Amino acid sequence: ELMGTPDDVINLSTLYMRIYFLGMPFFMLYNYGAAVLRAVGDTKRPLMFLIAAGIINACLNMVLVIVFNLGVAGVAIATIFSQFISCVLVLRCLNKTDASYQLRFSKLKIKGYYLKQIFQVGIPAGIQSTVINFSNALLQSSVNSFGSTAMAGYTAANNILGFLYASINSVTQACMSFTSQNYGVRKFKRMDKVLIDCAILSVGASLVFGCGAYIFGDKVLMIYTNSEDVIKCGVEILSITTVPYFLCGIMDLFPGALRGMGYSLVPMILSVIGTVGMRIFWIFVIFPNHRTLYDLFISYPASWTATIIMQVICFLVVRRKVHSQINK
C-alpha cells in the first residue's frame, strides 16, 4: 500500500510476497555455499545447480499454474522449491568434498576472528543492497502511479534487465574473488590486470545483450504478455535503460575490486550517495515536473554515471594506498 500498488493487483502481490519469503533461508544458504565454491575457483558447479533449479522452476510453473490452476501462489511455490533444490545441491557438494573447505555439520561453530572479518565486508555490502532496493521500491511506487498497465510493462522489462544484470554481476563476483586472491599474495600487477579484463568483459557483455534487448525488446516482451499497451510501456523502459546498461557494469566493478582488497564501507557509502541519493532526488524533485516514464527511468543512467565518478576516485586512492603497502 505504501508503494501505491493498484487495488486490482495488491492482493495477488501480497500473496506472492508472503510465500516467496518462506524460501529466503534456502536462497541465502545457496549463495553462501556458491560463494565458497567460487572462491576456490569452482564456478561451474554453482552454475549447473542454478540451471537445474531453473529448469525445475520452469516445469513446476507450468504444472502448478496450468494444470492445478494455482496462479500467483503456484509461481511462488515453484520459486521457493527451486531455491530449496539449489540449496540442497550446493550443501551436498560442500559436504562430500575432501578439500580443505569441506562442510562438516558436526563441527560447525562460530569463530570470532572470522566472524568479525565477515561482518566488516558483509554488513556494508548488505546495507548497500538493502538501501538500493529501497530506492528501487520508490521507483516502483512511481511506476505504480501510472496504473496497472505501466506496472505490468515495468515488471516484464525488469525481467529482461535481470538477465542483463546477471551477466555483469557474474563478472563483478569474479573480479572480487580474483582480486582478493591476488591481494592475499600481494600480486599488485595481477590485480590491475584482473580489473582491466573484467571491465572489458563487463562492458562487452552488457553492450551485446543490451543492444540485443533494445533491438528485439518488443519480441522478447511478448513472452511475458500479449497486451500491446503493456508491451509499449516495456519497450519504452528498455529503450532508456538497455543501451547504457554497461554503465551499471562499470559501477559495480570498482566496488567489487575494493571489497576484494578488504575495503567495503566506503564503496557502500558512495553507492548509497550516488545511486540512492540521485534516484531519490530525481523522483521527488525532477519527476513531479515531468511525469512520463522516460523522465522517470532516465534516473537510471544518471545515477550510474554519478556513482561511477565517485567509485573511480575512491578506487584510485585505495589503489595508491595498497601499492605503497606492497612496496614496503
Q: What residues fall within each predicted segment?
A:
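Short alpha-helical transmembrane segments in multi-pass integral membrane proteins
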Residues: 1-23, 67-123, 179-244, 286-328
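Transmembrane helical elements of multi-pass membrane transporters/channels
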Residues: 19, 30, 53, 82-86, ...
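Short runs within selected transmembrane alpha-helices of multi-pass transporters and secretion channels
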Residues: 19-38, 46-57, 75-90, 169-173, ...
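Small-residue-rich hydrophobic transmembrane alpha-helices
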Residues: 27-46, 153-217, 248-271, 282
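Structural signal for membrane-spanning alpha-helices in multi-pass inner-membrane proteins
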Residues: 35, 61, 65, 90-94, ...
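Membrane-helix interface segments
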Residues: 43-45, 71-72, 149-150, 264-265, ...
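Structural preference for long, well-ordered alpha-helical segments within the folded cores
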Residues: 58, 62-63, 126, 190, ...
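Transmembrane alpha-helical segments of integral membrane proteins
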Residues: 277-287
